[in-house]
């Protein structure tokens, strides 16, 4: 069985939530009375996996998600699987099946139908193999949920390290995951699109709408 490390990068400022009056760190904001990060951890941790939340208390302020992950690289088995999950999403899926599918290729990415301009998007062929990933540009109706699996952690980490060393920055000048994935695609890695119903909790409005659906 593939050893899997789960990493939840959570060193961002959560600026939109703080501007809306939230006084706790974004990962600790309650979602139906349960901290956001706790819900994500319970949802994305495969059987037998080791999970880490990489927050500012561990790595300090960082320059984007890739930077956060690389600063915690010592926690990751480079020859095992790596599952990365952003803290502001909820996906309706069976995580063990997701990992199983990812292991038939070089990895897999959770996707869902959307046209929101603040997300990343992919193109995929008829077999579900991703051919392109673009950040903050609606190039298809297949959005990235924020959950990624790589069969060999080393391959993603090598790509992430190259992006940072070459100072290839994305949205708001940050080192973003989509850049590392785009590099992997250019180098011939096969990553699969795994469709699943997804709720994005990236803004206060997203959170309020989600909680309203469950409490009204």
Model-predicted regions and their roles:
Residues 1-56:
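N-terminal glycine-rich phosphate-binding loop and ensuing alpha1 helix
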Residues 3-5, 49-52, 81, 106-107, ...:
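Residues at the starts of beta-strands that form the adenosine-phosphate
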Residues 10-11, 55-57, 86-88, 112-114, ...:
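Fold-independent oxyanion-binding glycine-rich loops
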Residues 18-19, 40, 93-96, 119-120, ...:
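Short glycine-/acidic-enriched loop or helix-start segments at secondary-structure transitions
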Residues 36-39, 68-71, 180:
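Well-ordered alpha-helical segments embedded in enzymatic catalytic cores
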Residues 43, 71-75, 183:
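A generic secondary-structure signal
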Residues 57-124:
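Conserved beta-loop-beta/alpha segment of the NTase-like Rossmann-fold superfamily
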Residues 99-100, 129-216:
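Catalytic-core segments of class I nucleotidyltransferases/pyrophosphorylases
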